[in-house]
Curated annotation (Swiss-Prot):
It comes from the Bacteria. Mg(2+) 2 binds at residues 298, 300. It is an enzyme of class 6 (ligase). Binds 4 Mg(2+) or Mn(2+) ions per subunit. Belongs to the CarB family. GO terms for cellular component: cytoplasm. This is Carbamoyl phosphate synthase large chain.
Amino acid sequence: MAKRTDIKKIMVIGSGPIVIGQAAEFDYAGTQACLALKEEGYQVVLVNSNPATIMTDKEVADKVYIEPLTLAFVSRILRKERPDALLPTLGGQTGLNLAMELSKAGILQELGVELLGTPLSAIDQAEDRDLFKQLMKELGEPIPESEIVTTVEGAISFANAIGYPVIVRPAFTLGGTGGGICTNEEALRDIVENGLKLSPVTQCLIERSIAGFKEIEYEVMRDAADNALVVCSMENFDPVGIHTGDSIVFAPTQTLSDVENQLLRDASLRIIRALKIEGGCNVQLALDPNSFSYYVIEVNPRVSRSSALASKATGYPIAKIAAKIAVGLRLDDMLNPVTGTTYAMFEPALDYVVAKLPRFPFDKFEQGERRLGTQMKATGEVMAIGRRIEECLLKACRSLEIGVDHNELKGLDTVSDHELVAHIVRAQDDRLFYLSEALRRGYSIEELAGLTKIDLFFLDKLRHIVELEQELVKKPVDIDLLTEAKRYGFSDQKIAELWQTDAASIRRLRRAYRVLPVYKMVDTCAAEFDSQTPYFYSTYEWENESIKSEKESVIVLGSGPIRIGQGVEFDYATVHSVKAIQAAGYEAIIMNSNPETVSTDFSISDKLYFEPLTFEEVMNVIELEQPKGVILQFGGQTAINLAEQLTKAGVPILGTQLEDLDRAEDRKLFEKALKDLGIPQPPGKTATNEAEALEAARAIGFPVLVRPSYVLGGRAMEIVENEDDLRSYMKTAVKASPEHPVLIDSYILGKECEVDAISDGQSVLIPGIMEHIERAGVHSGDSMAVYPPQHLSKQVQDKIVDYTKRLAIGLNCIGMMNIQFVIQNEQVYVIEVNPRASRTVPFLSKVTNIPMAQVATKLILDQTLKDLGYQDGLYPESSLVHIKAPVFSFAKLAKVDSLLGPEMKSTGEVMGSDLTLEKALYKAFEASYLHMPEYGTIVFTIADDHKPEALALARRFSAIGYQVMATEGTAAFFADQGLDSQLVGKIGGNAHDIPALLRKGQIQAIINTVGAKRVADQDGQVIRSSAIEQGVPLFTALDTAAAMLRVLESRTFSIEAI
């Protein structure tokens, strides 16, 4: 069947904001697909609500709509654009669910829009638990005994019949949302009640738990002519029972016999054929380690997180091929873009091993529930490639950026045996490190396999690493052993530790004895055919396949795994920087370790090195490539943290230099710079111990804002009210030291705003000023930002522009910088300066049409703003109002408090744009899934300091028809001021307390603030987590609630009696 000529215009749905379970892999898939469809000559219309994506750039599609991914908005765009077809399989669960809604609402039929790729029947059969069960029965594929339930009672009677443990899986949800393993009736009641609420079709599957089986995944493709192939097989290190997104994964499978592999492979191909999927599909299976029996766990009839991993692991571009299949091309028509000679029908073969490790947010959320289960918790992932399992596993550990350079966590050697075993049995995010510690203590791999059901093969690899450590201790400075340790992935740092020397000495020793890495190509065909991909990984072998080109090159360091505080925004900037390097006539080389992103798509750069972003690995590439220099500005804190070591090693850093980076990051130098430039900042001091901290706080006066120096995303940042709180902060939150002092600032309660500026050293371009809706005290990444500013006087804006120019020139900034200001009584103070690209770059680039990262890169490569046609100063404002709103993943993270403060908690962002502030706010709230009806009940439970302000909001809510409920203290205050409210209990287990009313669906929103004292308020935390569980809008900052109120008021007609 040939390419379809009866369709001209295709709409692609993106996946919206990044949340746990749906991250940057969909930006990668969507970008690939849009470009592939344009390549085939189709007109592409893209809809996505997330501005921090490459796919929402104007060059990627013919028309780009950054609008909420809701039925109402997408229907309007469909009516306006009238596309011939819709491709929903690249937008994750969001895209699939929207396609189902559009179909059920009759919109697709009304407009004659055809669904491409996966038929609706297949989405239904794969996602609807009942239909899936029927299909598997017809195919004779075994699935665990299960029952579809729509009530809690139904679940309990089925569990009693088959016995516990059972697994609960809500239908049509993402990343295991609302699911879990239940070992008793009480747990089952809780999980099913919640799961039924979260499932859009109020349906849960209760199934026999097969926890402990091997979890195997196959990434399969099929075309309309029924050609099908397996792109990649993957094996989870962790057995069934832990969500695959939270598991360590190896590709290809490592422990299956040929018979087992063929058995599961055939089952996967039978399933994709039966579902008639045209495109990519992911099949998850459970294999009994002691027999040939297996079960089908689930099928994702779309591009997924696993397909991004499979694409990067094999070099086979799944999303690109899936998009072309959707328009009628066949696998045996298309050339494999990697080899250029073989066809896409040719199954990839790997002559290396790939390890994926999940990146968890528990460095940010120390109170979070770290136990792993069927609900996903990781925010991102890293991938490493090597010739041996030990090698790729250790490289992946280094890539995580959690302060480890080996499979070893500091401090575990002091943990008791009892605690060690408990940690190993109940898997947490750091189980790998506990397993390694147990092996160092002499536990046998058989004992550990008995406790964990992890295959002996994998545990034996961990044991081999431990044996090598012991050998190294016994034989210091043995060159043969050094070579062997490097072949198995040991870092110079780890070898230095075992030989009691420093990493630099090991590096010198290696170079003296020519123990150097070579770079191998990822070519999809195990070197069987000649391949053209510039995609490399390091290993300690003989033949080097990466040849330095004749052209002068520039290396850009990526930002590593996605985590809270360092998201896809930095990858966006990296990709744009590469475009500018190429446009300036240089060869662009990317180094990065994240398989989900666009930057690690090998077609983006001239060369891609898939490596950990550590000094050792970066230096190895620099020594081979001999670049003009390295750009660090776009890789977030990851890259900036390498500046000092690289500068000392004589590597040319392009853009802002180390001493100027230090002047922005080092407290004393920064204060001096501000003083010299005549720019005010909140009074502040530094402290290296508790006594100094108390002395500093007394001098400045409470409340103070405390934080460690050199961090991203406000990690361990707090507003402290009194001396007791400060003492506890110094004891628990930070390890202060002379090298890493704690910063203590006066906390100014004012309006916050921020600026991204681009400087060539002489002139400074300020694309725009963003005003935050939440006042100072809420992290800038968690605040709603408005552009252009709505409430800043001309005088304040002029002052911001003046200070920005002075800072950029005074700090010798070349390229990007981000400055945050706080404004109190028309006085402007600088809070912080980051001499690098920030997370607002994509948003501002979109709303001003300035490709900021490209402009900054051109300046770094010696052009001027004038050369590029930009004026000095503030760029003319847009006529529309644009809002950047944060999106959170609290529903996935039990025990994490959703109260907003100076520590960043959001995982993603959306954008809302319109002619007025109210309309833009409405879109931003809709896009971030904060939907409030036009009437209902709102609960106020407010701290004393905020009551007067909350009263004004309560009066306005009452005026538009909301019923106001309040907890005791708040209700009494309202009554004194003449406002009637209905009294509601906080938590007390009665039928009229907040959690009970939330469960009954009788509350539409909650406003809950905590006083400046931020006392450990257990009640408040229970109320907040109940609201999150029930999906009820929760506001912990009055400013956000006031913004929502403006929207509701703007949608309400006034009704007055005459």
